[in-house]
Regions:
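Intrinsically disordered, low-complexity, basic-enriched segments
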Residues: 1-82
């Protein structure tokens, strides 16, 4: 997917969360992207951030940076021994 499309989509998510309480905006954006974006889309937007992230609204940029800095932990490969 082209970066401009991802930027548009991410900013649309951000616009939705603008109506939430201020302390819920960035976490809400991050949670939505984490839950509903394919890992390839997330990796592409992370690379876009690394390249400057032009065009991303400030709360969207912050949410993506938070996601990038705190990667998901999958329990699929973790040891669950007793």
């Amino acid at each position: 997917m082209k970066p401009d499309r991802l930027v548009y989509m991410a900013n649309q998510i951000g616009k939705f969360f603008e109506s939430q309480r201020a302390d819920e905006v960035v976490p809400g954006i991050a949670d939505h992207i984490k839950k509903f974006w394919d890992p390839r889309m997330r990796n592409a937007i992370f690379a876009y951030i690394d390249a400057g992230g032009d065009g991303l609204d400030p709360p969207v940029r912050e949410a993506i940076v938070r996601l990038k800095e705190k990667p998901e932990h999958s329990t699929a490969t973790s040891f669950q021994g007793t």
